[in-house]
Amino acid sequence: EVLLEGPSGVLFKDGQKKYLPPGVKIVLLSKAGAVLSNGDNVQF
């Protein structure tokens, strides 16, 4: 779950921080993780 999303990054509920390059967004979010528009995956 996303706790906070801003133009330069995302803070997930579990405390993970992911810095995002300009223009990159979350395209898919589930209980297991997130997929970003640049193809990166974040697992939680």
Swiss-Prot record:
The keyword Repeat applies. Disulfide bonds: none annotated. Calcified shell. It holds the Pfam family Cuticle_1. The keyword Repeat applies. Sequence repeats lie at residues 3-20, 27-44. It comes from the Eukaryota. One of its GO terms (molecular function) is structural constituent of cuticle. Keywords: Cuticle, Repeat. InterPro entries: Cuticle_1. This is Cuticle protein CP463. It comes from Cancer pagurus (Rock crab).
